[in-house]
Amino acid sequence: MGKIIGIDLGTTNSCVAVMDGGKARVLENAEGDRTTPSIIAYTQDGEVLVGQPAKRQAVTNPQNTLFAIKRLIGRRFEDAEAQRDKDIMPYKIVAADNGDAWVEVKDQKIAPPQISAEVLKKMKKTAEDFLGETVTEAVITVPAYFNDAQRQATKDAGRIAGLDVKRIINEPTAAALAYGMDKGVGNRTIAVYDLGGGTFDISIIEIDDVDGEKTFEVLATNGDTHLGGEDFDSRLINYLVDEFKKEQGIDLRNDPLAMQRLKEAAEKAKIELSSAQQTDVNLPYITADATGPKHMNIKVTRAKLESLVEELVARSMEPLKVALKDAGLSVSDIDDVILVGGQTRMPMVQKQVADFFGKEPRKDVNPDEAVAIGAAVQGGVLAGDVKDVLLLDVTPLSLGIETMGGVMTALISKNTTIPTKHSQVFSTAEDNQSAVTIHVLQGERKRAADNKSLGQFNLDGIQPAPRGMPQIEVTFDIDADGILHVSAKDKNSGREQNITIKASSGLSEDEIKQMVRDAEANAEADRKFEELVQVRNQADQLVHGTRKLVEEAGDKLPATDKSAIEEAVKALEAASKGEDKADIEAKIQALVQSSAKLQELAQQQAQAGEAQADTSAKKDDDVVDAEFEEVKDKK
C-alpha cells in the first residue's frame, strides 16, 4: 500500500507532508519552499502556472491570476460572501448555470473545485518527487466551520486532481494532532485558534493519554468561513487607495494593474508591521494622468494598521465565547492555546487571544505547517503506520429538515461526534397526501429560510390517509468526512428514497468525471511534451558532438563521409524544430549510422593517445628513487 499524504489546502498558501520514518515530514516543492502560494494563473499561451511562478506574473496578468479561490468553494453566486468578493477581486466571479459561484477566465467558466485541483496536483507532484513513487491517496484539511457543500466541493477537487481523498479533517483538529504527537504525555484540554488567509476557526479539543494511547476528542468548534488575512489586506488596500485619491485625485480601483501591485505591497507591509513599528509603501509609477506619472509613497504605522483591522480581530472573539459555552468549559479549564494560520503572527491578534484566555499562546507550533503535519499523521493512522491514536471530530453545525410552518427541525445537533446516525419519524400535513418533499438544512436558526439549504428530494407513493397518520422515517447519517447522507422511508409501504447531499458543490458526477478526464489528458500532454524535450536535447548533444569530431578528424575523414554527415546533421536540426518525436528519433539514428566512419576514427585517435601516455609512463619508470639526507651547515 502506498503512502497517504497530508495536504493543507489553504486560502493563501498550501502545504504537503508525509509520514517518514515514524515522523511527519513537511516536503519542499520544486522551488525549494515548504509552502506553496495557492495561486493559479492561466497565461496567454494556454499554460497553467501554480504557486510562486503564478504569483510572480500576477502584476502583468491580474484578470487571469486566481487567488483565494477557497473562499468561493461550495458557495452560491447570490451568497453575500461571494457578492462581496465579486466587488473586490481583480478576476471575474460569475454565476454558473446551476447558480454556483464560478470564475470566468478568457471567456471560459471554471468551477472552484477545478481551480483548487491545480494546487492539489502540485502538492501531489511534490510528494511524488520526494517518495519516488506515484501517490493516489490523501487526507485533505478544511476549516472546521465548512458546511457540507464546501466539504463535498473540496473532495471533488481532490478527485479532479487524481487523488482518492481518504478523509477530510478539520484544520484545528489536524493542528491538535501535530501538537499532541509532539508534546509528550498527559491529559490536556487545548484551544486551537486558527486564523488563516480566508477562514477562521476555533476548536476546543481534549487530549486523553492512557498508557501511551492518545484520544483527540473535539468538544466544540465554531468560526467564520469568510474572515482571514485577505480581509486584513483589503482594509489596508482600501486605506492606501483612499489616501492616494486624497493626494492625487486618482482612484486606483479602476486600474487592475495598479491594484495588483498594491495588493502585493499591502501584504508585504502587513507582514513587516508584525516586527516593525512602521513601514513605507513605496510604489513608483503606480499610475499616470495628463500631468505625467504618479508615485505612491505612504507611511503606515503599526498603530494605523491595528485601527484599520480592530473590528476584524474583535469579530474573531465572539466564536471563542460560543465554543467554550458549547464545550461546557471556562477559560481556566484550557491548558494550552495553539495559534495556527499566518495571520496569527500579528502581535495584536496574539495579544487579544492572550487577554481572552489569560495565558500566552504557545510559540513552539509552526502556524504554517502544523495543519499539514496533522493531516499526514491522520494519513498514517488510516494507512496503519501510526498506532495508538484515535480522532473524534464533530459536526460544526446542526442538521435537520424543514417542517410545517417553515420551521427547521434538527435531527443532529452541532458539536455531535462523527460519524453518527440519527432517525426521526415525521408525518403528512394534508389529508390523502401522496408525496412529501424532504428539504435538508444546515444551521442554527429556527426559521428554515435563514439556514443553509443543502438540497431536497421527494418521497412519493405514500398511501392515501388522513393527515398525521402516515409514518415517514427520516434518517441522517454523517460519515467520518462530515459529509451527510439522508434517507426517507414510508414505514407503511416500505418505499425508500435516499441521497448523498451534493448541494451547492454543484458539480454533477458527469462533470467531475469530465474534469478528471481533462486533468488526465493534460497530464498525458505534459508527459509527451517532456519526452519531446528530452529527445530534442539528445539531438542537440549529438549534433554538437558530431561537429566537434568532424573538426578534430580534419582530412582523415573521407569527403563522401563528411558530406553524408553534414546532410544528416541538417536533417536532424530541421526535425528538432518540429513536434514529431518519432521523426527526430529516426533522424538521430540516421546521423549515428552516417557517422560510423567518424566514430571509428575517433576511437583510433583515442587509442593512439593512450599508447603515447603508456610510453611516457614507461620512461618515468626508469628513473631511480634515491634517498637523501639533509646536511645542515655547521656554524
Swiss-Prot record:
Put simply, this protein is called Chaperone protein DnaK
Top-level taxon of the source organism: Bacteria
Task: Output compositional bias ranges, type Low complexity.
Answer: 603-613
Q: Which HAMAP family match?
A: DnaK
What are the inducing conditions? Answer: By stress conditions e.g. heat shock.
**Which Pfam families does this chain map to?**
HSP70
Where are the residues of the annotated region Disordered?
Answer: 603-635
Q: Which residues carry this modification: Phosphothreonine?
A: 199
Q: Does the keyword Magnesium apply?
A: no
Print the keywords alphabetically: ATP-binding, Chaperone, Nucleotide-binding, Phosphoprotein, Stress response
Similarity comment: family membership: Belongs to the heat shock protein 70 family.
| Gene Ontology molecular function: any one | ATP binding
Which cysteines bridge via disulfide bonds?
Answer: none
The reply on keyword Phosphoprotein is yes
InterPro entries xrefs:
ATPase_NBD, Chaperone_DnaK, Heat_shock_70_CS, HSP70_C_sf, HSP70_peptide-bd_sf, Hsp_70_fam
What high-level taxonomic lineage is stated for the organism? Bacteria, Pseudomonadati, Pseudomonadota, Gammaproteobacteria, Enterobacterales
Q: What does this protein do?
A: Acts as a chaperone.
